[in-house]
């Protein structure tokens, strides 16, 4: 703990020593010593106070006043009832918060309260409803190194979900991809492994939570080590609460379509930069339950590789397709977030209204079960168990949806459940009526118009009279408290009524608290049934969302390809089409790829013609297919793809000292080192980040290599190197291009993909419409004409040498030389040959 305080005078240091020597500050320092990496929220009355370095950090982040206790100790504070807003801002800044509550005096007659830390809130352990971001998952990652493998867990404490997986150290791309999918709020590593993870490139700007090392166990049981780390962290952060995680799901290789980090980002599956709009998730999300929304996101990021799973989803959709969905959609809106409610129950953060949510959810589930069974839809919920739980809650819970947010702020149990409770409530109601009656009587008796009877938790009930009228108070008024502008009194009659009310309130609180706790325990007994119900509800919500998307966007059911070929007819980009302005239509395109004769498409066309969009729509159609959803196309026959790679666009990674070209080559290397025969690869402009011949040589070599494979991965290779179209003579390679139309001095991008190669790049036209100054555009056009006619290279000295070893230079034949080589002399007369020779002489003289 850093206790450094600036100050120069001897008096200051004397004041500081004295301030830190008080019983309260000694207590603070003792507690703070055990939680040095947290900001300690130290409860004092109705405030949480922060001291010393905690106060400096918190006041800066929260933008609240920093003051000094006894002129020496820096401090700041927040009201206890509004702590969630402040905690949320500290969590967003990556801080941990220790909540220290006060209970009772340390000993009889002592003014110092007993205080204990009851909860440590960290970015990855949030379960409090007000601190979570809507329905979204909030994951914590635990990483563990054992020999040549990295084991990792992704746990969402707010829902209880838990995922395990592992990857070789040599394949860190998988770990990085999983971190991109789960986006953990906090990453934990064992103390002894911290330096290893800090050295990894991906983690260089990441903060870690350091965990105590666990005892060694057999190598085959390393997932158990992850469980131990999680259990220990739960005990540390939740203290004595009963929080538990569910059985882990193993993310085994081959079960889901693998996508690396770059692919997830390039395709904008769930995020578009820092925005959430214009993504596959945003246009597809028609879900009405929190579980459905989380499940949809998981299925986008983890498309299936098992055809039987796809058939199962399609069968459910076929049943739902025959009915009117509106009643089901309306019913789903009444289902609460069961997973998070159960977690709150275990973590002692539940609310009275959570029981109403469970009751409404079960009621909805029972209705849905009846209707879906009639349709032969497999809605597999534990109906009988849920009915028993529903009856138990119904017997006790106060009717209506206006249950109190906090227990004690209104009726929680229904009238008639407890005779003792009913009597206490009646006494309380009567007592409050007596208070109103007494106030009216006293105003009339004393003729004091400022007289009011009020209540607070410290003073209790009191008669308040303004200072101006206080001297006129009757002699039977007993003074209770003096304030700046008023005097407070009591009377024997008021004290008697107060005792009646407070005794009634105590009885009400005692009964409701005891029954609340009992109801929590009872609900937790049915956790398994409720979670099973939640999964079924989420899946139903997902299937309905799929059907809504189909109807809204005109998508079709794809077929499963049995021969590995990919055939999309008039396919469209789902996100671009969904977000087009009214009146605009997306231009559809077709593509066929197999693993032999038409495996590798070299795609040419100008910038802005739509090459990247075309490639992305192929990838998104494939993902939708493997989610078990419909796809935007006229028809689609698609294979199961095991890995999807995209190399679309790259930028400098300056913080890591990496150029655009180096980033591009790293991404390309990852693809070439990890693809399989069943992969789908989308390359965009490989080699553009270096000199023309370097880049073209690399691109050429990649295409030659892929062509040489006996079974070729399905590949789209977009390029501006038109020379690469000559490779269509190689096995499996064919050409596609984006059609354009030249009209007067304009170029129309028709967005249509055709077989063949592009004639021009139209780069100068794109520069013109982008706003490049006219003199530069004109000069560029002149140079282009000159270069294309003479085929001469303008050599500009490069600022850095090439990254590759230059092969021995071989002069390419000139246009004239190529013309000579093409002459068929055996078919020409001597006169014709002499005439051609004369033409060549004239042409060469002009070029000198």
From Swiss-Prot:
SUPFAM superfamilies: DNA repair protein MutS, domain I (SSF55271), DNA repair protein MutS, domain II (SSF53150), DNA repair protein MutS, domain III (SSF48334), P-loop containing nucleoside triphosphate hydrolases (SSF52540)
GO MF annotations, alphabetized: ATP binding; ATP-dependent DNA damage sensor activity; damaged DNA binding; mismatched DNA binding
One Gene Ontology cellular component annotation held by this UniProt entry: cytosol
PROSITE patterns: DNA_MISMATCH_REPAIR_2
Residues noted as binding ATP in the record, renumbered to the chain: 605-612
Classification via InterPro entries: DNA_mismatch_repair_MutS, DNA_mismatch_repair_MutS-lik_N, DNA_mismatch_repair_MutS/MSH, DNA_mismatch_repair_MutS_C, DNA_mismatch_repair_MutS_clamp, DNA_mismatch_repair_MutS_core, DNA_mismatch_repair_MutS_N, DNA_mismatch_repair_MutS_sf
GO biological process, one term: mismatch repair
Record bears the keyword DNA repair: yes
Keywords: ATP-binding, DNA damage, DNA repair, DNA-binding, Nucleotide-binding
Keyword match ATP-binding: yes
Family the entry assigns: Belongs to the DNA mismatch repair MutS family.
Function according to Swiss-Prot or TrEMBL: This protein is involved in the repair of mismatches in DNA. It is possible that it carries out the mismatch recognition step. This protein has a weak ATPase activity.
Name assigned to this protein: DNA mismatch repair protein MutS
């Amino acid at each position: 703990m850093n206790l450094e305080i600036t100050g120069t005078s001897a008096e200051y240091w004397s004041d500081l020593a004295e301030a830190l020597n008080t019983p309260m500050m000694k207590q603070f320092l003792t507690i703070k010593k055990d939680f040095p990496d947290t900001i300690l929220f130290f409860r004092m009355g109705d405030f949480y106070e922060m001291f010393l370095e905690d106060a400096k950090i918190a006041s800066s982040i929260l933008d609240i006043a920093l003051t000094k206790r006894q002129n020496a100790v820096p401090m700041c504070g927040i009201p206890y009832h509004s702590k969630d807003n402040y905690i949320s801002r500290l969590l967003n800044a990556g801080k941990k918060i220790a909540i220290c509550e006060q209970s009772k005096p340390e000993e009889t007659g002592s003014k110092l309260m007993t205080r204990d830390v009851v909860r440590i809130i960290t970015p990855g352990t949030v379960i409090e409803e007000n601190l979570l971001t809507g329905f979204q998952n909030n994951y914590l990652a635990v990483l563990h190194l054992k020999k040549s493998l990295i084991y990792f867990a992704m746990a969402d404490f707010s829902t209880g979900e838990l995922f395990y997986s592992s990857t070789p150290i040599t394949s860190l791309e998988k770990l990085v991809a999983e971190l991109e999918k789960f986006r953990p709020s906090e990453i934990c590593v064992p103390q002894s492994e911290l330096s290893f993870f800090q050295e990894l490139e991906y983690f260089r700007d990441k903060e870690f939570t350091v965990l105590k090392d666990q005892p060694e166990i057999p190598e085959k049981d390393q997932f158990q080590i992850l469980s131990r780390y999680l259990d220990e962290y739960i005990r540390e952060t939740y203290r004595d609460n009963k929080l538990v995680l569910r059985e882990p799901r193993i993310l085994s290789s081959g079960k889901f379509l693998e996508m690396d980090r770059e692919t997830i980002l390039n395709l904008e599956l769930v995020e578009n930069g820092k925005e959430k709009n214009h993504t596959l998730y945003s246009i597809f999300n028609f879900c009405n339950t929190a579980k459905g929304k989380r499940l949809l996101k998981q299925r986008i990021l983890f498309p299936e590789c098992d055809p039987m799973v796809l058939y199962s989803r399609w069968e459910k959709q076929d049943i739902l397709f025959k009915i009117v969905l509106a009643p089901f959609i309306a019913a789903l809106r009444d289902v609460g977030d069961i997973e998070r409610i159960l977690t709150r129950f275990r973590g002692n953060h539940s609310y009275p209204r959570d029981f109403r949510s469970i009751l409404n959810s079960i009621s909805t589930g029972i209705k849905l079960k009846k209707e879906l069974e009639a349709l032969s839809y497999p809605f597999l919920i534990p109906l009988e168990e849920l009915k028993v739980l529903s009856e138990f809650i119904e017997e006790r819970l106060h009717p209506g949806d206006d249950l109190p947010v906090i227990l004690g702020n209104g009726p929680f149990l229904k009238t008639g459940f407890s005779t003792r409770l009913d009597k206490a409530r009646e006494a309380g109601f009567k007592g409050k009526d007596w208070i109103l009656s007494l106030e009216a009587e006293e105003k009339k008796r004393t003729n004091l118009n400022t007289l009011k009877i009020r209540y607070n938790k410290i003073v209790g009930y009191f008669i308040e009279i303004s200072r101006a009228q206080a001297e006129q108070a009757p002699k039977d008024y007993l003074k209770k408290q003096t304030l700046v502008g008023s005097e407070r009194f009591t009377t024997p009659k008021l004290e008697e009524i107060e005792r009646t009310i407070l005794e009634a309130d105590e009885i009400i609180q005692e009964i409701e608290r005891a029954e609340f706790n009992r109801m929590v325990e009872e609900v937790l007994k049915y956790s398994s049934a409720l979670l099973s119900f939640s999964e079924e509800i989420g899946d139903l919500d997902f299937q309905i969302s799929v059907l809504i998307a189909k109807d809204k966007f005109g998508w079709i059911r794809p077929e499963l390809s049995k021969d590995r070929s990919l055939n999309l007819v008039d396919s469209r980009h789902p996100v671009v089409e969904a977000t087009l302005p009214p009146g605009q239509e997306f231009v559809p395109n077709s593509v066929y790829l197999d693993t032999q004769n038409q495996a590798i498409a070299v795609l040419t066309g100008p910038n802005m013609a739509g090459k990247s969009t075309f490639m992305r729509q192929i990838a998104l159609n494939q993902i939708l297919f493997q989610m078990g959803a419909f796809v935007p196309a006229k028809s689609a026959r698609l294979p199961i793809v095991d890995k999807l790679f995209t190399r679309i666009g790259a930028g400098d990674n300056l913080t890591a000292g990496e150029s655009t070209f180096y980033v591009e080559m790293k991404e390309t290397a990852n693809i070439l080192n990890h693809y399989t025969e069943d992969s789908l690869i989308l390359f965009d402009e490989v080699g553009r980040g270096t000199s023309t011949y370097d880049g073209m040589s690399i691109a050429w070599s990649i295409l030659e290599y892929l062509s040489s494979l006996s079974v070729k991965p399905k590949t789209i290779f977009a390029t501006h190197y038109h020379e690469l179209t000559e490779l269509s003579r190689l096995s499996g390679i064919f050409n596609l291009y984006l059609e354009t139309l030249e009209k007067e001095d304009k170029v129309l991008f028709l967005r249509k993909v055709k077989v063949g190669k592009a004639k021009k790049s139209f780069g100068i036209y794109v520069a013109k419409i982008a706003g490049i100054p006219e003199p530069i555009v004109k000069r560029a056009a002149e140079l282009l004409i000159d270069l294309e006619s003479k085929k001469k290279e303008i050599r500009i000295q490069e600022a850095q040498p090439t990254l590759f070893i230059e092969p021995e230079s071989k002069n390419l034949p000139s246009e004239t030389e190529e013309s000579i080589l093409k002459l068929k002399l055996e078919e020409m007369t001597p006169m014709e040959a002499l005439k051609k020779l004369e033409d060549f002489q004239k042409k060469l003289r002009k070029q000198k």
